[in-house]
From Swiss-Prot:
Record's subunit section: Binds to the N-terminal domain of the chaperone ClpA.
Organism phylogeny: Bacteria, Pseudomonadati, Pseudomonadota, Alphaproteobacteria, Rhodobacterales
This protein's name: ATP-dependent Clp protease adapter protein ClpS
Entry similarity comment: Belongs to the ClpS family.
GO biological process, one term: proteolysis
Chain segments carrying region Disordered: 1-27
Pfam family, one: ClpS
Cystine connections: none
InterPro entries reported for this sequence: ClpS, ClpS_core, Ribosomal_bL12_C/ClpS-like
Summary of the function given for this chain in its UniProt record: Involved in the modulation of the specificity of the ClpAP-mediated ATP-dependent protein degradation.
Species, as recorded: Cereibacter sphaeroides (strain ATCC 17025 / ATH 2.4.3) (Rhodobacter sphaeroides)
Bias-annotated ranges (Polar residues): 9-24
């Protein structure tokens, strides 16, 4: 018994001179939208508490946290990070809950990038 490679014409019953090409299109995977997490300034939350929040919930160094805290203080708000929806939502909830438990009016929000 002699084996030979299977050709496209073998499936369709053609003569073997079929020159059609099969193409497979790939749909491009769409990236999920990203969300900015923002801290808003207020006149009551101590600066050191804001620095602590940035270090604890966003993994920033003390120097990075201090810079963002100063931006919030001077400009009224600052972008802390950009995340997927679920991560941004969780970080906002964690910050807001932590601020409330410590009786600070610190506001943290998210918006689509």
């Amino acid at each position: 018994m002699k084996l030979r490679p299977l050709q496209m014409s073998d499936k369709t019953g053609g003569t073997g001179d079929d020159t059609s090409i099969l193409t497979k299109t790939r749909s491009k995977t769409q990236r999920p939208p990203l969300y900015k997490v923002l801290l808003l300034n207020d006149d009551y939350t101590p600066m050191e508490f804001v620095v602590h929040v940035l270090e604890r919930f966003f993994g920033l160094s003390h120097a990075q946290a201090f810079e963002i805290m100063l931006t919030v203080h001077k400009k009224g708000l600052a972008v802390v990070g950009v995340f997927s929806f679920e991560v941004a939502e969780t970080k906002v909830a964690q910050v807001m809950d932590f601020a409330r438990r410590h009786q600070h009016p610190l506001q943290c929000t998210m918006e689509k990038e």
